[in-house]
Amino acid sequence: MLQPTLTSWVILAGGQASRMGGKDKGLIALNNKPLIEYVIDRLTPQTSNILINANRNQDDYQQYGPVFGDHFQNFPGPMGGIHAGLLHASTDWVGFVPCDCPRINEDLVERFCRAVTDETDILVAHDGNHQQPVFTLYHKRVLPKLTAFLERGDRKIILLYKECHTQYVDFSDSPDCFVNLNTPEELTQFGQLES
């Protein structure tokens, strides 16, 4: 099994948050606590190597750990953050989680590490019905393929998965860990459920 200490984990907070009215999702409060703090609280017992990908409000995010922005500017979606994370992390294996999922599994890192094989390039979480492409673990050897993918302007992650040795990690026993909060209404509803 890959040791969790040999991985870095990047919290993806670099999006435009258009469905949240453009507000930086990681800094939006849920029950008086920024969303990113929920993610950090879940990740910290699992790994000591946490980084943050943010393209705005970097000074605010620095209180939580090292922060870096995308190298491919104005690239929609998480792929720019994944690319930057692979460049910035000091480990060969780099995991990614979104900043707006307060219920991340307490054994997420371990599950990913257990699934690694010698051939693995990319691991992607699967909830039993759908793949969860922002809950993922990449080996740095994917970086040249990902760079070429972004330079071509490709947006369909499934195309990159086909170029790499991609495997899926089973989270069908805990699909709620992928609940993400994209709109003010979802945030309000989730806050009421959590209270």
UniProtKB/Swiss-Prot annotation:
EC nos: 2.7.7.77
Binding-site residues, GTP: 12-14, 25, 53, 70, 100
Needed cofactors: Mg(2+)
A matching Pfam family: NTP_transf_3
Catalytic activity, as annotated: Mo-molybdopterin + GTP + H(+) = Mo-molybdopterin guanine dinucleotide + diphosphate
Keywords: Cytoplasm, GTP-binding, Magnesium, Metal-binding, Molybdenum cofactor biosynthesis, Nucleotide-binding, Transferase
Keyword match GTP-binding: yes
An annotated Gene Ontology molecular function: metal ion binding
Superkingdom, taxonomy of origin: Bacteria
Chain positions recorded as Mg(2+) binding sites: 100
SUPFAM superfamilies: Nucleotide-diphospho-sugar transferases (SSF53448)
Assigned GO CC terms: cytoplasm
Cell compartments where the protein resides: Cytoplasm
Top-level enzyme category: transferase
One biological process term in Gene Ontology: bis(molybdopterin guanine dinucleotide)molybdenum biosynthetic process
Domains as described in the record: The N-terminal domain determines nucleotide recognition and specific binding, while the C-terminal domain determines the specific binding to the target protein.
Subunit-structure text: Monomer.
Function in brief: Transfers a GMP moiety from GTP to Mo-molybdopterin (Mo-MPT) cofactor (Moco or molybdenum cofactor) to form Mo-molybdopterin guanine dinucleotide (Mo-MGD) cofactor.
Name of the protein in question: Molybdenum cofactor guanylyltransferase
Gene name tied to this protein: mobA
